[in-house]
Amino acid sequence: MQYLEKEEIKEIQLALLDYINETCKKHDIPYFLSYGTMLGAIRHKGMIPWDDDIDISLYREDYERLLKIIEEENHPRYKVLSYDTSSWYFHNFASILDTSTVIEDHVKYKRHDTSLFIDVFPIDRFTDLSIVDKSYKYVALRQLAYIKKSRAVHGDSKLKDFLRLCSWHALRFVNPRYFYKKIDQLVKNAATNTPQYEGGIGIGKEGMKEVFPVDTFKELILTEFEGRMLPVPKKYDQFLTQMYGDYMTPPSKEMQEWYSHSIKAYRKS
């Protein structure tokens, strides 16, 4: 296998993003750059220099349409990784892979090798805010069921580290996919025709930070991203401020190193 340098990884990810963008335009599926990718677009007009992720989000119905279309197109390189397509995958979002590549990321998780990817997040609409706290707890338990023992120790408090280690030992034989089902059921039960809120449920560990008034993400605009014009919510400032605070000020060098990922990527022979 051929080792991929950072710029080569970026080119492969952007080609994958171009494929997703063209697929969404072809099938009239609205999506937007999300999380750190949205931040990168607004602050850097491209990817955050010390980050190597690309994230997009769609409303749940569009999310399911996009995944179905990509699966049915059966592209020779680009494939869907989700709970339904993999026996080991446990996240409540999907990834689109470039299967001509392989990555290793064994720093945090007892995980399988996979491919360079773009994460695809569903946006759900709801009224019952209790699902946010419930899903947050399931996400925390799911993470403990899959991280390496060393990652359960944070060093923030002896008591908290002790409790996390106890939970880690209790959960190490639990399949993390169990928590996917719990979160998925929460989302389905919360579906309503008169929602007040929207956001990513069971996606990460931000809790109420990821909850916004309904239709926050409905209206999209185009912004520059790595020489392309790609969609972000018109209310991007509301999202970025709520998620990151003073988002136009880059973090310190130390924090940039903390945020950076430890992925080694290779092109298959």
Model-derived features: positions:
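Conserved catalytic core of two-metal-ion nucleotidyltransferases
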Residues: M1-K25, I70-D128, Y146-G155, K160-M243, ...
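Active-site nucleotide-donor binding segment shared across nucleotidyl transfer reactions
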Residues: N21-I54, L58, Y63, D215, ...
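Short, conserved charged micro-motifs
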Residues: E64-K68
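Short, His- and charge-rich active-site/binding loops that engage polyanionic ligands
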Residues: Y138-V139
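A short secondary-structure junction signal
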Residues: L129-S135
